[in-house]
Amino acid sequence: MTLDFSLSGNTVLKNINLILNIDRVNFKLHTSLRISGEQWDEEKKRPKNIYLKKYKKLNNKLDSLKKELVLHLNQRQIQKKEINQKSLSRAIQRIMDGNKELQLENSLLSLIKSYIVDRNDFICYSTYKRYKVFYNLIQRFEGYIMKHLFIEDVNMEFVKKFIAFGKEEKYSENTIYRTIHFVKTILNFVEKKGVRTSVREMNIKREKQQKEIVTLSEKEILKIKNTDLPQDLKAAKDWLIISCYTGQRFSDFMKFSIDKMVEINGKTCIKFTQQKTKKKVILPLHPSVKNVIQRNENSFPEPLDIVTYNKQIKLIAKIAGINHTLSARKRVGHRAKSFIMEKWETITSHIGRRSFATNFYGKIPTPLLIQATGHSSEQIFLKYINSADKEYIVSLSNHFLKMYNNKIKDSTELTKS
């Protein structure tokens, strides 16, 4: 059996027809769905841009139609009922009239939904969005195999087919394997409810991609500090310096304000709650951050939105001459690909966090700071940086001051020579 879609009609909006072949008998069936011929991918038999809202919705309908029709055909074969043009047209009409995709009990998608609901009070919005990405990917995979997946279908055969699907659709290996591991999480969730699954046979070694991490070195940060810039770029420059010496996410450092500053054992700190993790943080301020505050009349710079900030820090790095070439990933269409580009082009709001971890790793004792290059490392890093222990705060602040004074000393000696 094969099932595909084709367009017909002489108007701008074309009719989408379903072409079904069963035992060498062809059926051409009307679906009531329409699309512009220019927006149709003739090779993949679907909209070209399945990520644009209206075409994503249309593609979901096409995937749902395939799954429901195959389910209908299987039921008629079991019941030994005739499959003809009339019965197929009625089935398509019934499927198209349904407002929502059929959610079958104990299907993989229904269990993923149940898991998300179960975890809803314990996860942040970014985690919820990531779960939805996994859900949508499994939903798309079901359309690809034209079948509803149930727990008994999730095994090593499922893994092989899903990997093949992911590679055909040009998803990164990271996306493919993270989705598979999420499905394993769902199986463990189901097992706790007393349902037997194949989770134990799914011994999958996660294939790690060589991640291209871009950071600013101490010399490059100094170069940015010493670069004269137009007035409209000075706030972004100051925030970039702040991010490189606090190591926090954009959502946190852009909300820094004087009223969040506290004194602990004579050390100036900033006290805040991280937006993503909801963890309370007390962080001693590096002298470079204090200098930025003093330059801004004992205040933090004016806050910027993330689009403006990302645009301006690229320009700042370009003006500062941070332009050597490197390999980095850039989004083209709907997928990220590796390109050789100038470093300033790769700079985004997260570079301060990565630079902080990289520049201080090995110079400050690892119990205080760990290089944040991945999720597991970041968790350890956050664990220590979130400690409210006063000895930790004083110790980290002293290390900041010692390194800063040494740098000033070296710079002075260089000038004298």
For each predicted feature, which ranges?
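Short, aromatic/basic-rich helix-turn unit that serves as a nucleic-acid recognition element
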Residues: 64-80, 106-135, 193-194
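Conserved tyrosine-mediated DNA breakage-rejoining catalytic core shared by Y-recombinases
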Residues: 255-292
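Basic, Lys/Arg- and aromatic-enriched nucleic-acid-binding interface segment
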Residues: 173, 177, 200-250, 305-307
